[in-house]
Amino acid sequence: MITQILHHQTRRINMEFQKLIEERRTIRKYSPEGKITKDELLTIIRAAQEAPSWKNSQTGRYYCVTSEDMVEKISKECLPEMNQAKAENASLIVTTFVHNHAGFQKDGTPDNELGNGWGCYDLGLQNENLVLKAWELGYGTVIMGLRTGDKLREILSIPETETVVAVIAIGKAAEEPARPKRKDVEDIVKFF
């Protein structure tokens, strides 16, 4: 009896997670209503932290920009024009990773040919958790890779030991994008 209950609960959780994955959308237009709170941002970043990382190095870092003045400054000075509109009415999360840790030995020797690629990979895993948790809490996101990293570093006092990767806009959606077409799974997988 208990085994059956646990089995059904596990299946329900998995179904809810699958639905979350399938229903999440990239949001490029945000409502001025319902700004995200500091507590909600902390909840989202805690979820990001749960992602696996190389030797549990946990090198992802997050710089949350919530004041309207700072969002406007970052948008105008650090994002290309095409991304500035995507930041309107949103808060911003600048994502970085501490370089020369993930994929490296303690003495600084790379573990393999990817080197700092592992830090970026690990941050991608964290950012996936971040956008899924945001969606679960009712917030949309868009990950923007086009940004001026040096200017972000200057404005937000990001240390030179970190690599600036992306700016994530986060807020209440003002649009409902259709589900984009996905390739057939048979087209992207090979079995041997």
Provide a role label for each language-model segment:
Residues 40, 53-123:
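Glycine/small-residue-rich phosphate/adenosyl-binding loop
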Residues 84-93, 157-179:
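A glycine-rich helix N-cap at a beta->alpha junction
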Residues 48-49, 94, 100, 111-155:
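Small-aliphatic-rich amphipathic alpha-helix that forms the alpha element of a beta-alpha
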Residues 25, 69, 147-150:
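Alpha-helix/helix-capping structural signal
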Residues 19-27, 32-35, 166-192:
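C-terminal helix-cap and adjacent tail motif
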